[in-house]
């Protein structure tokens, strides 16, 4: 028996579960992955040799494809990863061959306030510590490849400043005439560091680089991470990397990684990360872990490759997308599925009573501050707040319905939830013909997710009418306005002069016609203002800038005050993470 989640922290439950987990070879054998298709990282973690495996299984029929999303979360999150793992365990309890795909946790949120993305309670993936602390090095590979592009750029700028055309020619170089004011990329690091959002580099002498403004972004927002999420084979990975625009010349020509002759080396650094990772739930179901982009500042999806493998090997494959349906699901729907060609069967919409009450609370209600205990007002029964908060749930239901998918609502149950509140939510959804599972997977594991699993199995029997929100023939400005209106609930969109100028240039060029819209926006509100709860009315989405990711083929409108480099809070997790000197194990994750 595993410890009770109510009285035991997640990391201790994980350590106990790890004493009896399957070897990676047993897990692979049960999945029909051959030994020669595994790249082991010890006894319980492996990478899959994707090229070997997929060439063998590509003609297998696809299993049922389930996407897990959520309502607008509180700063604590509402247990989407936990539900993804819990549902996988529940389907396993029902005798189904099942896997799930999740993203690798970034060290930034792990050491800050969000913690690990390993799930919690009795619905976790293991080994938890290794998963949480670097894993197999994929984020480092992305970080190193990204920063190598910046090394190539800044060193080239220095050499062009110091050497004549004749000397450059002797060294096999042509003058690119890079404009230091039009460098598109910054550096990346896998931490949340507000002090690195705006920096100046090259402050030394003639040999120390060109003096210019620069920045650090968090590694998970790198264009390379989006590329890792979206590619389907090695050829595509290399092609997309070579298309990344790092800067512009003084005459306005794009400078790519290919121009800098660094795309091959970047591909070499990314090569190990190309293969998906395999671990397990605490009940022994397979978990694919691949890619790590956030949904608010990036694409927010685990990789297409992980889903392709999971679908070919299993009857059911569960994948999760970041944050709420307004950003994570919208990007899954209109970017990931359009790129992959895969069509999901069912969407699971996760909600909690605390989040619903948060969205329906009075204006003077207590703030939820990450790192601080949840105010008791959101734990205690409050039918008035709950009823008002249902507007947020209804809005997310409407978003998913626009995709044509069947929906199962999952109430991620907490011990403080009352029967009256749970019955109210169930009745609300059932009146719309939507099944609602009251799921206790956090406390009871797969056994607590059986109702959810049963509803999902039934929903998978329906024919999917999945369709996209927009066609690529629609101008990019119109796509942004459509997402703002139909998904976020905005009245209109205001573009800054800079954003409008960039969009007009983009719309005039055919090369951008199939670039997807990937809006960077706060996850804490349907609007671009994180303080607006519920379903804001009478508001305008403000787009302050437009980023273009040529390799990932994404147009990224930046909404409101969102930053590509989060900051570290005053109560970060790193203060409670340590090493037990007697056991040699990490504590506090």
UniProtKB/Swiss-Prot annotation:
Pathway: One-carbon metabolism; tetrahydrofolate interconversion. PROSITE patterns: FTHFS_1. This is Formate--tetrahydrofolate ligase. Belongs to the formate--tetrahydrofolate ligase family. It catalyses: (6S)-5,6,7,8-tetrahydrofolate + formate + ATP = (6R)-10-formyltetrahydrofolate + ADP + phosphate. GO terms for biological process: tetrahydrofolate interconversion. ATP binds at residues 74-81. HAMAP family: FTHFS. GO terms for molecular function: ATP binding; formate-tetrahydrofolate ligase activity. Keywords: ATP-binding, Ligase, Nucleotide-binding, One-carbon metabolism. Pfam families: FTHFS. It comes from the Bacteria. Its EC number is 6.3.4.3.
């Amino acid at each position: 028996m595993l410890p009770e989640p109510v009285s035991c922290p997640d990391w201790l439950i994980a350590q106990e579960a790890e004493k009896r987990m399957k070897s990676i070879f047993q897990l692979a054998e049960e999945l029909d992955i051959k030994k020669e298709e595994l790249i082991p990282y010890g006894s319980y973690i492996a990478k899959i040799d994707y090229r070997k495996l997929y060439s063998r299984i590509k003609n297998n029929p696809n299993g049922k494809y389930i996407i897990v999303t959520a309502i607008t979360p509180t700063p604590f999150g509402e247990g989407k990863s936990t539900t993804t793992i819990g549902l996988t365990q529940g389907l396993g309890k029902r005798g189904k061959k099942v896997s799930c795909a999740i993203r690798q946790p970034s060290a930034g949120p792990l050491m800050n306030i969000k913690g690990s993305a390993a799930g919690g309670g009795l619905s976790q993936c293991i080994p938890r510590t290794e998963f949480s602390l670097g894993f197999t090095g994929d984020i480092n590979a992305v970080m190193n490849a990204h920063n190598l592009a910046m090394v190539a750029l800044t060193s080239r700028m220095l050499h062009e400043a110091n050497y004549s055309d004749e000397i450059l020619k002797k060294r096999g170089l042509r003058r690119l005439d890079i404009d230091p004011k039009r460098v598109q990329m910054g550096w990346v690091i896998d931490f949340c560091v507000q002090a690195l959002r705006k920096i100046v580099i090259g402050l030394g002498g003639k040999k120390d680089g060109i003096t210019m403004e620069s920045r650090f972004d968090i590694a998970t927002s790198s264009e390379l991470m989006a590329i890792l999420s979206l590619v389907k084979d090695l050829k595509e990975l290399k092609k997309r990397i070579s298309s990344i625009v790092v800067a512009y010349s003084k005459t306005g020509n794009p400078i790519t990684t290919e121009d800098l002759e660094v795309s091959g080396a970047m591909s070499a650094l990314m090569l190990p990360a190309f293969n998906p990772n395999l671990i397990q739930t605490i009940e022994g179901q397979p978990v694919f872990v691949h890619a790590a982009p956030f949904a608010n500042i990036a694409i927010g999806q685990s990789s297409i490759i992980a889903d392709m493998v999971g679908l070919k090997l299993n009857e059911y494959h569960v994948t999760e997308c970041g944050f709420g349906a307004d950003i994570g699901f919208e990007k899954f729907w209109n970017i990931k599925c359009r790129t992959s060609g895969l069509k999901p069967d069912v969407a699971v919409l996760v909600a909690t009573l605390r989040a619903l009450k948060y969205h329906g609370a009075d204006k003077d209600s207590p703030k939820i501050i990450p790192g601080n205990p949840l105010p008791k007002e959101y734990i205690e029964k409050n039918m008035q707040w709950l009823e008002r908060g249902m507007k947020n749930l209804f809005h997310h239901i409407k978003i998913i319905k626009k995709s044509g998918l069947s929906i199962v609502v999952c109430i991620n149950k907490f011990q403080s939830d009352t029967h009256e509140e749970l019955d109210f939510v169930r009745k609300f959804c059932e009146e719309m013909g939507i099944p609602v599972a009251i799921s206790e997977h956090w406390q009871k594991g797969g056994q607590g997710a059986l109702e959810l699993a049963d509803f999902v199995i039934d929903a998978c029997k329906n024919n999917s009418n999945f369709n996209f929100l927009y066609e690529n023939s629609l101008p990019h400005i119109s796509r942004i306005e459509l997402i703002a209106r139909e998904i976020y609930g905005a009245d209109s969109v205001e573009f800054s002069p800079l954003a409008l100028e960039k969009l007009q240039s983009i719309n005039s060029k055919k090369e951008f016609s199939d670039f997807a819209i990937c809006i960077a926006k706060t996850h804490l509100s349907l609007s671009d203002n994180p303080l607006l709860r519920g379903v804001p009315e009478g508001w305008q989405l403000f787009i302050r800038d437009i980023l273009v990711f040529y390799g990932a083929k994404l147009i990224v409108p930046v909404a409101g005050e969102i930053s590509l480099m989060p900051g570290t809070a005053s109560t970060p997790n790193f203060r409670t993470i340590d090493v037990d000197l007697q056991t040699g194990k990490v504590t506090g994750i």
